[in-house]
Amino acid sequence: MAEQTTKDDKPLFGRPWIFIRGVPAMKFLPPEGPLEVAFAGRSNVGKSSLINALVGHKGLARTSNTPGRTQELNYFVPDGFSGEGGDLPPMALVDMPGYGYAEAPKEQVDAWTKLVFDYLRGRTTLKRVYVLIDSRHGIKKNDEEVLALLDKAAVSYQIVLTKTDKIKEAGLPKLLADTAEKIRKRPAAYPGILSTSSEKGDGLEEVRQAIRLTVGIPF
């Protein structure tokens, strides 16, 4: 696929981003067009903070994560595109519902699982899922279940460690190595592990570059 450029040659992450849609069911998905990358992770893993930090908009993801939208797929795109007549954004970020919260009723968990699996299995424009893991806790059982779901759906995913400012700096190399070993034999896992701190800004450019490479946008 040829590399894309963004409208007016503005850098992908150098322009404003906006929330465009919350998707509670497959029938509400936007038409397939721009490539998509999605973010998944346990509740309170720092998904909203990371998305906000990546696009430089402190309140963007939080605005869409109000009660009632927490079980939706939330779509964000660069601003300045009408969405009509071929004037489409170059890509979309998709914030997936957080998982692993004990108070969620079974019906809600089942609905989330169906929505997410249907999305993963049937969305041809989805290029990669970034699975966020809290550095303080590592990969937990809930995460293993999601990784297995991604493997089953044959969707490429990459692990992103979050909140690295909350652990000792000397422990990060071992955590990276241990995490890489845990996913080494998983068929859909991308081998490189990313590490971030939204609070300190660490690792953000590496994630941006990973996204650019994934969707074929050079800058």
Curated annotation (Swiss-Prot):
<dbReference type="GO" id="GO:0000917">
    <property type="term" value="P:division septum assembly"/>
</dbReference>
<keyword id="KW-0132">Cell division</keyword>
<feature type="binding site">
    <location>
        <begin position="68"/>
        <end position="72"/>
    </location>
    <ligand>
        <name>GTP</name>
    </ligand>
</feature>
<keyword id="KW-0717">Septation</keyword>
<keyword id="KW-0131">Cell cycle</keyword>
<feature type="binding site">
    <location>
        <begin position="95"/>
        <end position="98"/>
    </location>
    <ligand>
        <name>GTP</name>
    </ligand>
</feature>
<keyword id="KW-0460">Magnesium</keyword>
<dbReference type="GO" id="GO:0005829">
    <property type="term" value="C:cytosol"/>
</dbReference>
<dbReference type="GO" id="GO:0046872">
    <property type="term" value="F:metal ion binding"/>
</dbReference>
<keyword id="KW-0342">GTP-binding</keyword>
<dbReference type="InterPro" id="IPR019987">
    <property type="entry name" value="GTP-bd_ribosome_bio_YsxC"/>
</dbReference>
<dbReference type="InterPro" id="IPR030393">
    <property type="entry name" value="G_ENGB_dom"/>
</dbReference>
<feature type="binding site">
    <location>
        <position position="48"/>
    </location>
    <ligand>
        <name>Mg(2+)</name>
    </ligand>
</feature>
<dbReference type="InterPro" id="IPR027417">
    <property type="entry name" value="P-loop_NTPase"/>
</dbReference>
<feature type="binding site">
    <location>
        <begin position="41"/>
        <end position="48"/>
    </location>
    <ligand>
        <name>GTP</name>
    </ligand>
</feature>
<keyword id="KW-0547">Nucleotide-binding</keyword>
<feature type="domain" description="EngB-type G">
    <location>
        <begin position="33"/>
        <end position="217"/>
    </location>
</feature>
<feature type="binding site">
    <location>
        <begin position="162"/>
        <end position="165"/>
    </location>
    <ligand>
        <name>GTP</name>
    </ligand>
</feature>
<keyword id="KW-0479">Metal-binding</keyword>
<feature type="binding site">
    <location>
        <begin position="196"/>
        <end position="198"/>
    </location>
    <ligand>
        <name>GTP</name>
    </ligand>
</feature>
<dbReference type="GO" id="GO:0005525">
    <property type="term" value="F:GTP binding"/>
</dbReference>
<dbReference type="InterPro" id="IPR006073">
    <property type="entry name" value="GTP-bd"/>
</dbReference>
<protein>
    <recommendedName>
        <fullName>Probable GTP-binding protein EngB</fullName>
    </recommendedName>
</protein>
<dbReference type="Pfam" id="PF01926">
    <property type="entry name" value="MMR_HSR1"/>
</dbReference>
<feature type="binding site">
    <location>
        <position position="70"/>
    </location>
    <ligand>
        <name>Mg(2+)</name>
    </ligand>
</feature>
<comment type="similarity">
    <text>Belongs to the TRAFAC class TrmE-Era-EngA-EngB-Septin-like GTPase superfamily. EngB GTPase family.</text>
</comment>
<comment type="function">
    <text>Necessary for normal cell division and for the maintenance of normal septation.</text>
</comment>
